[in-house]
UniProtKB/Swiss-Prot annotation:
This is Large ribosomal subunit protein uL4. NCBIfam families: rplD_bact (TIGR03953). The lineage of its organism: Bacteria, Pseudomonadati, Campylobacterota, Epsilonproteobacteria, Campylobacterales. It comes from Wolinella succinogenes (strain ATCC 29543 / DSM 1740 / CCUG 13145 / JCM 31913 / LMG 7466 / NCTC 11488 / FDC 602W) (Vibrio succinogenes). GO terms for molecular function: rRNA binding; structural constituent of ribosome. GO terms for cellular component: ribonucleoprotein complex; ribosome.
Length: 204
């Protein structure tokens, strides 16, 4: 059974909580589809080559059809000419987005969390709030955890807490709206607030 580690306010181990058995039935393909869709949405789609209809010039036939001994040509915009259009080149009007429905997104997140739990890298804490807003306090929290590359997930975005975590290189603070399967998979460990963890693991 996959279990998340419960932490107290000092981020010391204080017990375990089991993930629902239904998480075991989720197929890894849901995570694959979501990550593929997420990365596709980040593509800049800036590669562009002009086709023969977009190259300037070419209104005049470059030489006579017959009598010159050269191959016939109708326009200097032809791909066979230097400076002509490009055949089958990249076009910036392509849409790389891949559709993933809400159910698949949810299953992908649940599967990613289950994987972290099986690795012993999923932690549940009552609150991640840093009232001081100071980076040193957020760093102390991270150092106590003794993990590399950690995703902290809070239920509600708090400005002071965000500022406290913002400058830490190996940490990232996400709220409930930002949390997704890609973020969970990208970090080595995940610390999530109890209220949000319960929302994700409940039925329905």
């Amino acid at each position: 059974m996959s279990k998340a580690i419960i932490l107290n306010n000092e981020l010391q181990k204080n017990g375990e909580v089991a993930l629902p058995e239904r998480f075991k039935e989720i197929h890894s393909h849901n995570l694959y589809l979501y990550v593929k869709s997420y990365l596709a949405s980040l593509r800049a789609n800036s590669a562009k080559a002009k086709k023969r209809g977009e190259v300037s010039g070419g209104g005049k036939k470059p030489w006579s059809q017959k009598g010159g001994g050269r191959a016939r040509a109708g326009s200097i915009t032809s791909p066979v000419f230097v400076g002509g259009g490009v055949s089958h080149g990249p076009s910036n009007n392509r849409n790389y987005d891949l559709k993933v429905n809400k159910k698949q997104k949810k299953l992908a997140l649940q599967y990613a969390l289950m994987e972290k739990a099986e690795q012993g890298k999923l932690y549940v804490v009552d609150s991640l709030q840093v009232d001081s807003g100071k980076t040193k306090d957020a760093y102390a929290m991270f150092k106590t955890l003794n993990e590399r590359s950690t995703l902290f997930v809070s239920q509600i975005s708090d400005e002071k807490t965000f500022l406290a975590f913002r400058n830490l290189k190996e940490c990232y603070l996400a709220d409930a709206n930002e949390l997704n399967a890609y973020l969970v998979a990208a970090f080595r460990s995940v610390v999530i607030e109890k209220s949000l963890f319960e929302n994700i693991t409940k039925e329905g």
